A protein has these predicted regions:
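Metal-dependent phosphoesterase core characteristic of DEDDh/y 3'-5' exonuclease domains
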Residues: 3, 20-25, 29-61, 85-183
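Short glycine-aspartate micro-motif
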Residues: 5-7
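Short acidic, Gly/Ser-rich segments with clustered Asp/Glu that frequently serve as metal-coordination loops
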Residues: 10-18
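Metal-dependent phosphoesterase signature
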Residues: 61-78
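Short, basic/hydrophobic alpha-helical segments
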Residues: 75-89
Length: 184
């Protein structure tokens, strides 16, 4: 297989990758021309009974512990499917604001389930890419062609949902993993 991009996103129980857990994962593989390769993957992770999501996470994502119990895979099966996708040879794992969050969620979940948390990032010609830095660079060096939303402070907002809305990109449901992947 030639090199591919694997666009992915998580929804989680909170905002701290070291203590919070994944609720949902979505990923879509594309070729180097950004044409889809195969079907998207959307899976839920069954929360252990001793883990509760923050109320904000439930409100933001719409995912409740009960939903994960009904629809979710065990964490071991959940991360196994993700690992298979991200560790396929010549895969570039791509996310939006992923270096400080999604990649960390992946690493902690891999570690808890006895996988090497870093191998998928470099083995077999693999790599990863957080495109938020590309968006920031575009704003700094060539801002024409995009509408740049601003926070109430007047600073630019690089939130995916704000950029999508300002540029009339149909996002679907913000903070639903597959919708965020397709928007990215």
């Amino acid at each position: 297989m030639d090199g591919t991009f694997y666009w992915h996103d998580y929804e989680t129980t909170g905002v701290n990758p070291s203590i919070d857990r994944p609720l949902q994962f979505a990923g879509l593989r594309t070729d180097e021309n950004l044409l889809p390769v195969g079907e998207p993957l959307t899976i839920f992770c069954k929360l252990p009974r001793d883990i509760l999501p923050t109320p904000e996470a439930c409100i933001t994502t719409g995912i409740t512990p009960q939903h994960t119990i009904r629809e979710g895979l065990s964490e071991r099966d959940f991360i196994s499917q993700i690992y298979d996708q991200l560790s396929a040879p010549r895969t570039c794992g791509v996310g939006y604001n992923s270096i400080n969050f999604d990649d960390e969620i992946t690493r902690y979940t891999l570690y808890r389930n006895f996988y090497d948390p870093y191998l998928r990032e470099w083995d077999q010609g693999n790599s990863r890419w957080d495109i938020i830095d590309m968006i920031r660079l575009t704003k700094a060096l060539r801002p024409k062609g995009f509408e740049w939303p601003e926070k109430h402070t007047g600073e630019p907002s690089f939130k995916l949902e704000d950029l999508a809305e300002a540029n009339k990109i149909q996002q679907g449901e913000a903070h639903e993993a597959l919708s965020d992947v397709l928007t990215t």
